[in-house]
Amino acid sequence: MIHLVFAAGIGLFGSPAFLSPQAPAEAAQDPATQRYDRLVAEANRATAAWSERVAALRTAELKGGDPVPADAWDSPLEVFIPRFVAAAKDYAGKDAAIPYLKWVAKTGMPMLGAGREAAKASLKELVTTHRASSSLDELEWMLGRMVYFFGEEEGRQIAAGLRTDSPNAKVRTWAVFSLNSGALESDPVDSPRYTAALKEVRAALAAVDLPMLAAEVENRVAVRAKFSVGMVAPDIAGVDLQGEKFALSEYRGKVVLVDFWGDW
């Protein structure tokens, strides 16, 4: 069952496909596009009704009524996943399948269970069969996690295919990041592999407008430069519970038993 994961997923991963602007009705001439538009419109209506229902239940709860039932938070889009998947299969291997596959990948990835599995399968179809499509940059962060989704060997093969075959520079940049993220995360910062990985990623980023990915890369670099194993930790000064000043550097070379509490 999908509860708050659905709502959280929207914030974490960006707006789902069903919230994207739709093409004007007069532009949707072919049957595949018309079918897609009808499904998206139906999903929109279901989402709007769900939002109103949950809002009403929440208002009643705040006024002293019963708590919102757990199943009220279930995604209204779970039932649409199989329908979009079926439509994609009807156009398998053709460009007409791409919008359906992207909808499933973006909408189902924040879900759990069958929704997420369908999203992964759709993502795989997009980055393999349809890797030459120029519109895959809409998948954004998913393109940089090929190893996470499909394992080391297959994930690297898929990313390499995107880097070679995609006509979209942003997609190729995400693929470069996917291929090098392991080295950036785990290799020693003074190793040739780390240096080469960082150089390749920065070169790819310099040619495109992907500010969030660029910031993520530089944040990783900064964190590892300051906090890698063997580095000297930044000094910290403070006042203890007895009002005495102390600094972290005073304890260098000593064995310290730390007993602490925190309130976050």
Predicted segments with their positions:
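N-terminal leader/linker segments that initiate helical-solenoid repeat arrays
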Residues: Q22-E78
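Bacterial N-terminal signal peptides
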Residues: M1-A17
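Specific register positions within alpha-helical solenoid repeats of the TPR/Sel1-like families, i.e.
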Residues: T47-A48, A105-G113, L143-Y148, L179-P188, ...
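Generic helix N-cap/helix-start motif at coil->alpha-helix transitions
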Residues: F80, G93-P99, R116-K120, R131-M142, ...
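N-proximal helix/coil linker or "cap" segments that precede and/or mark the start of modular domains
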Residues: E185, V189-R252
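Short active-site neighborhood of thiol/selenol oxidoreductases, capturing the structured segment around
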Residues: F246-W264
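Alpha-helical adaptor scaffolds
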Residues: P69, K102-T164
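Amphipathic alpha-helical scaffolding segments comprising HEAT/armadillo-like alpha-solenoid repeats
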Residues: I81, A114-K124, E152-A160, P188, ...
